[in-house]
């Protein structure tokens, strides 16, 4: 196979994670996953931006993408996409946890972490499930995530979906 084919395939493989990660901002309010609890440092675990409702929407949208992908590949892509979406959201929550420990409020910016936390979470489960991803596919997805995150967040800001352009 060609490198171009491999890069296009990597987009398809990571599409559930991208969709899951991008669906969260559409939920404006909800029950915080951390139930408003603080960590031992007195700061919130994740903050109000990580909600059960957002998680459900992310899992639903990401898994729906997997159902569509499974029509072209194998039925196991439904399960893979559910787990990929879940781990992408876990990666996103770990990113929020790290930001709270650093004293960065919800909506605060940490270049790199904001764009790649969900990719790292999704990559973990994809590797554990033995989905074949090459190093250049992974690097391509990281670069794509970095630039797409910047662009889509700016558009979401212009559309008043997000409060900040990052």
UniProtKB/Swiss-Prot annotation:
Its pathway, per UniProt, is:
Membrane lipid metabolism; glycerophospholipid metabolism
State the EC number(s). Answer: 2.7.7.67
EC class of the enzyme, as a word = transferase
Instruction: Name the keywords, alphabetized.
Output: Cell membrane, Lipid biosynthesis, Lipid metabolism, Magnesium, Membrane, Phospholipid biosynthesis, Phospholipid metabolism, Transferase, Transmembrane, Transmembrane helix
Which pairs of Cys residues are joined through disulfide bonds in the record? none
**Which Pfam families does its entry note?**
CarS-like
Recall the GO molecular function terms of this protein's record. Answer: CDP-2,3-bis-(O-geranylgeranyl)-sn-glycerol synthase activity
Q: Which reaction does it catalyse?
A: 2,3-bis-O-(geranylgeranyl)-sn-glycerol 1-phosphate + CTP + H(+) = CDP-2,3-bis-O-(geranylgeranyl)-sn-glycerol + diphosphate
Has the keyword Transferase been applied to this entry? Answer: yes
Query: By what name is this protein known?
Result: CDP-archaeol synthase
What is the organism field in this record?
Answer: Saccharolobus solfataricus (strain ATCC 35092 / DSM 1617 / JCM 11322 / P2) (Sulfolobus solfataricus)
- Tell me the name of the encoding gene: carS
């Amino acid at each position: 196979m060609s490198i171009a084919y491999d890069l296009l395939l990597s987009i398809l493989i990571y599409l559930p994670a991208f969709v899951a990660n991008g669906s969260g901002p559409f939920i404006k309010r909800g029950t915080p996953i951390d139930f408003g609890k603080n960590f031992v440092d007195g700061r919130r675990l994740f903050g109000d931006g990580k909600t059960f409702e957002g998680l459900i929407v992310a899992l639903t949208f990401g898994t729906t993408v997997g159902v569509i992908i499974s029509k072209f590949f194998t039925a196991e892509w439904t399960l893979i996409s559910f787990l990929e979406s879940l781990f992408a959201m876990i990666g996103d929550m770990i990113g929020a946890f790290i930001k709270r420990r650093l004293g960065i409020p919800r909506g605060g910016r940490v270049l790199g972490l904001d764009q790649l936390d969900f990719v790292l979470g999704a990559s973990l489960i994809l590797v554990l499930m033995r989905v074949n991803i090459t190093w250049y596919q992974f690097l391509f997805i990281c670069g794509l995530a970095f630039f797409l995150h910047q662009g889509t967040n700016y558009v979401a800001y212009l559309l008043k979906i997000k409060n900040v352009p990052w």
